[in-house]
Design a protein with these regions (language model features):
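NAD(P)+-binding Rossmann beta1-loop-alpha1 motif at the extreme N-terminus of oxidoreductases
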Residues: 1-53, 61-63
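A short, aliphatic-rich alpha-helical micro-motif
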Residues: 68-69
């Protein structure tokens, strides 16, 4: 298992992050929007880009690029 950073929380970034967690990796995703980060971390969803998809607990988000990396 590796720790992976995904830069961007749009549909592609969120789908990639989800796929990586499903395959056993811990993923920290960078997002520029604080409300998106809160939604991902608190509700484990990103309804704007992947409606109806529950994101894994191993996927977290931050607005801090250094923290993501």
């Amino acid at each position: 298992m590796k720790k992976v950073a995904v830069i961007g929380s749009g549909s592609w970034g969120t789908a990639l992050a989800q796929m990586l967690t499903v395959h056993g990796h811990t993923v920290r995703m960078w997002a520029r929007n604080a409300s998106t980060v809160a939604e991902i971390n608190e509700r484990h969803t990103n309804e704007k880009y992947l409606p109806g998809i529950l994101l894994p607990q191993a996927l977290t988000a931050t607005t801090d690029r250094a923290e993501a990396l």
